């Protein structure tokens, strides 16, 4: 053996051909700081081998390299800008040395080669991939851009257009797609990968393949005429502005960096990449997006730990068809758990099956499935008007009308029709689980399972623990939600649970602004364009349904009278009384018309202004800053209360529930990350400025305590060691 590090080793394969094998402890290879340093040590050894004729890079794992070690990012990005720049310069010098070896190099790619793994691949002369390989640069999804030469080598290898598409969108592509654009030289069966790699290297050694000619374009300026460059970069910038917008600077920075480096050789282009990377890495957007990635891993890890000894349900049932029931049935069947769908109404059953069929047909149209798969999934959804087959159900979810009397009657009846060990869950959005459990003989087998609409798109499922819910019940439901491809987050019981409990104070802030003379159109614009919500509050209420919100608002007011009981008639009341229920009947805050695809399109409707005038003071101007503060303080305060009361277990789970359940802008990272970014002391000052507006604006005790020493909610991340102490030599 020529060299053995902790995460890779170097060996002779055959006469003159060495292999560099990535083999980190654990299940996957990551390109962390230690591996970059170890790669440098391996190159020290290789550069001294006078009889070296070629180098093969491969992985001992099921994937080549899954990317950088993202757990290092938060601390690495905390180091001073100059030190981070120095470390990047060191890392790039390692990849340059790999690229500059005086012999042909080839990378044998199996599984994932993402981020730094892809950048390692790009430094070699030839690339072979197995059919399951996926190669790409997802950095912009984390608020950064490639930092190990990806923005330099990929455009020179593929051409500007293909490279810009991959880098700006943070895409990874299949082996076949990589072959088509020239990212790999061939796709070979896994069992033939090493054999094919050695054959290609021998051809390069013998001069049949010109490896030096393959390498040269990566060292030179991008081969683009002035007209081609103008077209490529203008189109790319336009697309990025349309898709990413101003809140996500990484994609635009990457495009502009590639454009600025187009006329430069490798080393000058890498210096530009370094210069662009460092400010992105130290931005609040990167901190938030990396935080979301880490929180997502944490939440998924909790679910995995919780269900370690739990068998995934083999048969499910849904009570109540229609859009929601049909969506749940589709998702369960699509992910491989057969489902019985019961309703008392034939029409509703037809609607439920129709909803599932519609979603499957969309998959068929997109080429994701064939007719056989479609028929197979539909065959596992069994519509019924009675309880036939319910004795087989491991888990049943009730999705009937949001009325406690109806739900209690249905739940009590269902309990008599299922096995004693069957878990029953309610898809209620606001009614306390312990209240619904009061009619059950086996309340320990009952919990809440709150899906979000549309079920097939929304990743979150709130799993609600009632007073008597057992751990086994929670584990069973979490297991089913995970099997359905959802992110389950366990919360404790209260009116509205977590997501709706924190959403309605946000709506209350909106109602108060309207009462005080604000224009709902301006509020929507500010909350969408400035704060970054996918929908402003007026538009969101129209989508949720004014009637639904009116009912839920009453439930929340009864549950939290001190804060959520209002003493005035608000905009939601006015629209509800006027029969303006939102998208469902074509008029709410806005009017709705069907577009060419049959989807509701928002259009202005001046008639609403006279209705709102009845419950509002005369119109007056509000600054964008005041609108954001008055909208967000009630929500953030309630989020903090939920943590303090143990409704939600951690800031990470709270932030993921907000991002996945409500569409909280990812570049803010969630309520706790947003609060930490401002600083708890500054946030408290803002809240106190508005506390005259009522109890929703009064900061909770725990927050006031944190603000007294400006403490964050997330653990303080210490900067990584200075670069001189990082493993750079």
Swiss-Prot record:
Pathway membership, UniProt: Lipid metabolism; fatty acid beta-oxidation
Region spans: Disordered: 708-729
PROSITE patterns per UniProt: 3HCDH
Record region (3-hydroxyacyl-CoA dehydrogenase): 311-729
Record key words, sorted: Fatty acid metabolism, Isomerase, Lipid degradation, Lipid metabolism, Lyase, Multifunctional enzyme, NAD, Oxidoreductase
Site residues (Important for catalytic activity), renumbered to this chain: 119, 139
GO cellular component, one term: fatty acid beta-oxidation multienzyme complex
Coiled coil start-end: none
EC number: 4.2.1.17, 5.1.2.3, 5.3.3.8, 1.1.1.35
One term of GO molecular function: 3-hydroxybutyryl-CoA epimerase activity
Annotated stretches, region: Enoyl-CoA hydratase/isomerase: 1-189
Nucleotide-binding recorded as keyword: no
Active site: 450
Binding-site residues for NAD(+), renumbered to this chain: 324, 343, 400-402, 407, 429, 453
Annotated GO biological process: fatty acid beta-oxidation
Family to which the UniProt record says this protein belongs: In the N-terminal section; belongs to the enoyl-CoA hydratase/isomerase family. In the C-terminal section; belongs to the 3-hydroxyacyl-CoA dehydrogenase family.
Subunit field text: Heterotetramer of two alpha chains (FadB) and two beta chains (FadA).
PANTHER family in the record: TRIFUNCTIONAL ENZYME SUBUNIT ALPHA, TRIFUNCTIONAL ENZYME SUBUNIT ALPHA, MITOCHONDRIAL
Cited function: Involved in the aerobic and anaerobic degradation of long-chain fatty acids via beta-oxidation cycle. Catalyzes the formation of 3-oxoacyl-CoA from enoyl-CoA via L-3-hydroxyacyl-CoA. It can also use D-3-hydroxyacyl-CoA and cis-3-enoyl-CoA as substrate.
Protein name: Fatty acid oxidation complex subunit alpha
Organism: Cronobacter sakazakii (strain ATCC BAA-894) (Enterobacter sakazakii)
Gene name for this UniProt entry: fadB
């Amino acid at each position: 053996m020529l060299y053995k590090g902790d995460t890779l080793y170097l060996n002779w394969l055959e006469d003159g051909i060495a292999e560099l094998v990535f083999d980190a402890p654990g299940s996957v290879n990551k390109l962390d700081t230690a591996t970059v340093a170890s790669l440098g040590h391996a190159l020290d050894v290789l550069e001294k081998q006078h009889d070296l004729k070629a180098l093969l890079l491969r992985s001992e794992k099921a994937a080549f390299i899954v990317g950088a070690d993202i757990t290092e990012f938060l601390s690495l990005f905390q180091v001073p800008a100059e030190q981070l720049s120095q470390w990047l310069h060191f890392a790039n010098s390692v990849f340059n040395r790999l690229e500059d070896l005086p012999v042909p190099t080839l990378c044998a790619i199996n599984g994932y080669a993402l981020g730094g793994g892809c950048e390692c691949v790009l430094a070699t002369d030839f690339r072979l991939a197995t059919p399951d390989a996926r190669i790409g640069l997802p950095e912009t999804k984390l608020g950064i851009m490639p930092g190990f030469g990806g923005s330099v080598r990929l455009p020179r290898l593929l051409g500007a257009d293909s490279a810009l598409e991959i880098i700006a969108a943070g895409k990874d592509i299949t082996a076949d797609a990589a072959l088509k654009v020239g990212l790999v030289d061939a796709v070979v069966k896994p069992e033939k990968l090493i054999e094919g790699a050695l054959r290609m290297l021998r051809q390069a050694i013998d001069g049949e393949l010109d490896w030096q000619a393959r390498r040269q374009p990566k060292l030179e300026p991008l081969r683009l005429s002035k007209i081609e460059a103008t077209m490529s970069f203008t189109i790319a910038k336009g697309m990025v502005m349309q898709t990413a917008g101003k809140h996500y600077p990484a994609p635009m920075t990457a495009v502009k960096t590639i454009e600025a480096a187009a006329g430069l050789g490798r080393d000058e282009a890498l210096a530009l990449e370094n210069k662009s990377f460092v400010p992105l890495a130290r931005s609040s957007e990167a901190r938030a997006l990396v935080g979301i990635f880490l929180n997502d891993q944490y939440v998924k890890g909790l679910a995995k730990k919780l269900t370690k000894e739990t068998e995934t349900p083999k048969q499910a049932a849904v009570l109540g068809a229609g859009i929601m029931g049909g969506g749940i049935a589709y998702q369960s069947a699509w992910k491989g758990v057969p489902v019985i769908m019961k309703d008392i109404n034939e029409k509703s059953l037809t609607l439920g099956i129709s909803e599932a069929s519609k979603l499957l047909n969309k998959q068929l149209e997109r080429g994701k499935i064939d007719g056989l798969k479609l028929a197979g999934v539909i065959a596992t959804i069994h519509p019924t008007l009675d309880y036939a087959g319910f004795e087989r159900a491991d888990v049943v979810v009730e999705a009937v009308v949001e009325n406690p009397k109806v739900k209690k009657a249905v739940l009590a009846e269902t309990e008599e029709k299922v096995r004693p060990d069957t878990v029953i869950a309610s898809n209620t959005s606001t009614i306390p689980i312990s209240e619904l459990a009061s009619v059950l003989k086996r309340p320990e087998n009952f919990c809440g399972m709150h899906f979000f609409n549309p079920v097939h798109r929304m990743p979150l499922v709130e799993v609600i623990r009632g007073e008597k819910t057992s751990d086994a019940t929670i584990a069973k439901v979490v297991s089913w939600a995970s099997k359905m491809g959802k992110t389950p987050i366990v919360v404790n019981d209260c009116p509205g649970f977590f997501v709706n409990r924190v959403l309605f104070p946000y709506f209350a802030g909106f109602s108060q602004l309207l009462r005080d003379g604000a224009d709902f159109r301006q509020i929507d614009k500010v909350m969408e364009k400035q704060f970054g919500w996918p929908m402003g509050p007026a538009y969101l209420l129209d989508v949720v349904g004014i009637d639904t919100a009116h009912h839920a608002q009453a439930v929340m007011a009864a549950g939290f009278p001190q804060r959520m009981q209002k003493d005035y008639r608000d905009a939601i009341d006015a629209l509800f009384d006027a029969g303006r229920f939102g998208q469902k009947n074509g008029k709410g805050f806005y009017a709705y018309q069907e577009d060419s695809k049959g989807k509701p399109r928002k259009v202005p409707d001046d008639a609403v202004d006279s209705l709102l005038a009845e419950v509002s003071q005369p119109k007056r101007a509000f600054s964008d800053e005041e609108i954001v503060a008055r909208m967000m303080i009630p929500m953030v305060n309630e989020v903090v209360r939920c943590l303090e009361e143990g409704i939600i277990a951690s800031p990470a789970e709270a932030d993921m529930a907000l991002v996945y359940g409500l569409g909280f802008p990812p570049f803010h990272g969630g309520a706790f990350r947003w609060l930490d970014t401002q600083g708890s002391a500054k946030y408290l000052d803002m809240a106190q400025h508005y506390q005259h507006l009522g109890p929703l604006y009064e900061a909770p005790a725990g927050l006031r305590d944190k603000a007294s020493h400006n403490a964050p909610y997330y653990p303080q991340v210490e900067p990584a060691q200075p670069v001189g102490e990082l493993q750079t030599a």
